[in-house]
Amino acid sequence: MNKSEYLKVVGERVRSIRLAKNLTQLDVVGRMTGEIDTTNISRIECGRTNPTIFTMYRLAEALEVQISEFFNLEDFFQEP
């Protein structure tokens, strides 16, 4: 898996967690107290940016999950 593919997988994971919690991107921004905007959330979720570990940490706090949840990728690597 190359970097671009990995970023997309992580972004999909962030998005699925957010949606499972019935939160909008704007809700997440509000919980992060202005540290990030909806454009950046969208870019993370689409895999178009490589966020810092601090951003991922703050995102995990906003979504009330452990940061490791973003990187739990076993389901993406299972053979069909």
PLM regions: where:
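DNA major-groove recognition helix of helix-turn-helix
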Residues: 32, 45, 55, 71
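Short alpha-helical DNA-recognition segment
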Residues: 22-43
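DNA major-groove recognition helix of helix-turn-helix/homeodomain DNA-binding modules
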Residues: 52-69
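Alpha-helical residues within the helix-turn-helix
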Residues: 19, 30, 61
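Short, charged recognition helix plus adjacent turn
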Residues: 2-4, 61, 71-80
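Helix-turn-helix DNA-binding elements, focusing on the entry/boundary residues of the two helices
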Residues: 14, 25, 38, 53-56
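A short, Lys/Arg-rich alpha-helix, primarily the initiator
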Residues: 1-20
